[in-house]
Amino acid sequence: MAADEELSGVWQARVVTLFPDAFPGVLGLSLTGKALQDGRWQLHTHDLRSFGVGKHRNVDDTPAGGGAGMVMRADVVGPAIEAAQRFARGRWPILYMSPRGRPFTQKMAKDLARCDGVTVLCGRFEGVDERVLEHFGVTEVSIGDYVLTGGEIAAQTVLDATVRLLPGVLGNAESTVEESHSNGLLEHPQYTRPAIWEGHAIPEVLMSGNHAEIAKWRAAQSHRLTQSRRPDLWAAKGAKE
């Protein structure tokens, strides 16, 4: 979407990337895609290549001090971020998708959804010149303890988790209340028809119509799953209480 097509007051994502064609990607599908079409949020990309230097629009160079790979240049990434930030207003953080960043969490998604927008920098190669991150006060964010070939997939993950929390994006707002991580715990198991499949029956309590017992069962299952699969979350939950 072009900059002159902005809708006033709508939550925006501005993505600085070498591969603008990667967007909207999955963000253009399902609920996030419908919300994008309906103008509930906006997505703009800024092509790093257009800020490249020299005849070949170079965006990277060899690491200072030696080493493998290439590093994205400050005099390329810097102007690209400045171009994106010209449209920033109010609370508008700049994120850099990086395996050394802060772990992305549901709480972070909620915080981003309360902002007016976000600029996301997608790295490539060995990363970005550190001076850019320091100059713009960029927050480094990681979606897990592994390395991707670039930040585009990670950026879409962060944006998907955030956009679905914006008002009016989800058909049922209660979905965000009961799902995993909404209260620091993993979500309870879900079932639907048929009542019996391949010899496996839906737990009787869920078919009982007793809402108090159903709520009790779901809470117990949520606790059980969190304890067994995410002891770190369980410990953090206990510490808060």
From Swiss-Prot:
Q: Which CDD domains match?
A: TrmD-like
Coiled-coil intervals:
none
Please tell me whether the keyword Cytoplasm is annotated for this protein.
Answer: yes
Q: Which GO terms describe its biological process?
A: tRNA N1-guanine methylation
Q: Where in the cell is it found?
A: Cytoplasm
Identify the EC number(s).
Answer: 2.1.1.228
Q: By its UniProt entry, which InterPro entries does this protein fall under?
A: Alpha/beta_knot_MTases, tRNA_m1G_MeTrfase_C_sf, tRNA_m1G_MeTrfase_TrmD, tRNA_m1G_MTases_N, tRNA_MeTrfase_TRMD/TRM10
Superkingdom of source: Bacteria
- Which terms in the Gene Ontology molecular function aspect does this entry carry? tRNA (guanine(37)-N1)-methyltransferase activity
Q: Which reaction does it catalyse?
A: guanosine(37) in tRNA + S-adenosyl-L-methionine = N(1)-methylguanosine(37) in tRNA + S-adenosyl-L-homocysteine + H(+)
The alphabetical list of record keywords is: Cytoplasm, Methyltransferase, S-adenosyl-L-methionine, Transferase, tRNA processing
Gene Ontology cellular-component terms for this entry are: cytosol
SUPFAM superfamilies tied to this protein: alpha/beta knot
Q: What does this protein do?
A: Specifically methylates guanosine-37 in various tRNAs.
In terms of PANTHER family, this protein maps to: TRNA (GUANINE-N(1)-)-METHYLTRANSFERASE
Subunit composition and interactions: Homodimer.
What protein family does this chain belong to?
A: Belongs to the RNA methyltransferase TrmD family.
Protein name listed in UniProt: tRNA (guanine-N(1)-)-methyltransferase
Q: Which organism is it from?
A: Roseobacter denitrificans (strain ATCC 33942 / OCh 114) (Erythrobacter sp. (strain OCh 114))
Gene name on record?
trmD
